[in-house]
């Protein structure tokens, strides 16, 4: 079973700039009308999937808090009160993918800059990230993978650690995608598939302008920790299961002022 750390993670991640980063889950909507990129390719869960995950999350949360008095605040339902989650430091493994000839990979400076962006974004949430190791692999198939067998092969060969460790795979994925991630609930059935895949050019210093500031990883790590998009569930009352984010009927691109798609 996946670790309690990540299934409880949503309780500490409410400060993330996810509304500003919200993009399409299915990867078929262009970011800011820029046909060059399709933004987030993380699989959008069905409402039934969300319900089952929430039930599992609450069971783990109640078990963790059993006998410890007042339960912690936040959680999937975004409730308030209680104690704050304990700070957690997450070990990170970067697996840089290059072509067979060793071309196209990100630099160590980019990796370090990306780690800084990630930690800055999660400051105040109770989570911080420390780079444990960077590996380099030369493989044409992995270098352009958009999923399927080549992704499975890549992760099976490279992934390190348990459910608590974050494995990141920057490469030159095709299809115009900027990245995708697995949710904590996927770990039990597919532990080797766990992790985050991003376009290397989206990291600081990359050429995926205007998406080259490192925010793609921030966004995808939110999914890896258990957060949904702010438009999950549309205008339904529970929405993304976080009470302090307003419901949205659809994804918002950029930072539109005064946007309200769920009136009334």
Regions found by a protein language model. Name each.
Residues 8-10, 100, 192, 236:
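A generic, residue-level signal for flexible/boundary positions that often mark functional hotspots
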Residues 12-15:
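Repetitive helical segments and hydrophobic/amphipathic motifs
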Residues 17-19:
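N-terminal signal peptide c-region/cleavage motif recognized by signal peptidases
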Residues 21-22, 240:
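Short linear motifs centered on Gly/Pro in flexible linkers and helix caps
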Residues 23-166, 170-175:
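Propeptide-to-catalytic entry region of secreted or membrane-anchored zinc metalloproteases
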Residues 112-258:
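Metzincin-family zinc-dependent endopeptidase catalytic domain
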Residues 260-264:
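Short, intrinsically disordered, charge-balanced linker/junction segments flanking boundaries
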């Amino acid at each position: 079973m996946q670790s309690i750390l990540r299934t409880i993670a949503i309780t500490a991640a409410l400060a993330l700039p996810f509304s500003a980063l919200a993009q399409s889950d299915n990867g078929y909507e262009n970011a800011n009308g820029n046909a060059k990129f399709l933004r987030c390719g993380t699989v959008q869960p069905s409402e039934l999937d969300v319900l089952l995950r929430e039930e599992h999350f609450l069971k783990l949360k109640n078990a963790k808090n059993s006998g410890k008095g007042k339960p912690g605040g936040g959680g999937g339902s975004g409730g308030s009160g209680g104690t704050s989650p304990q700070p957690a430091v997450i070990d990170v493994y970067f697996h840089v993918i290059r072509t067979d000839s060793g071309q196209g990979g990100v630099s160590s400076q980019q990796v370090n800059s990306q780690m800084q962006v990630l930690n800055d974004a999660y400051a105040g949430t109770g989570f911080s990230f420390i780079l444990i190791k960077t590996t380099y692999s030369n493989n044409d198939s992995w270098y352009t993978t958009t999923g399927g067998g080549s992704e499975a092969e890549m992760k099976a060969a490279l992934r390190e650690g348990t459910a608590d460790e974050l494995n990141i795979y920057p490469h030159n994925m095709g299809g115009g995608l900027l990245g995708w991630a697995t949710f904590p609930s996927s770990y039990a059935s597919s532990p080797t598939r766990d992790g985050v895949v991003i376009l290397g050019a989206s990291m600081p210093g990359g050429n995926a302008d205007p998406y080259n500031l490192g925010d793609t990883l921030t966004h995808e790590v939110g999914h890896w920790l258990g957060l949904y998009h702010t438009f999950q569930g549309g205008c339904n009352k529970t929405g993304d299961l976080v009470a302090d984010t307003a419901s949205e009927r659809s994804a918002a691109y950029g930072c539109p002022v005064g946007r309200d798609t769920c009136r009334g």
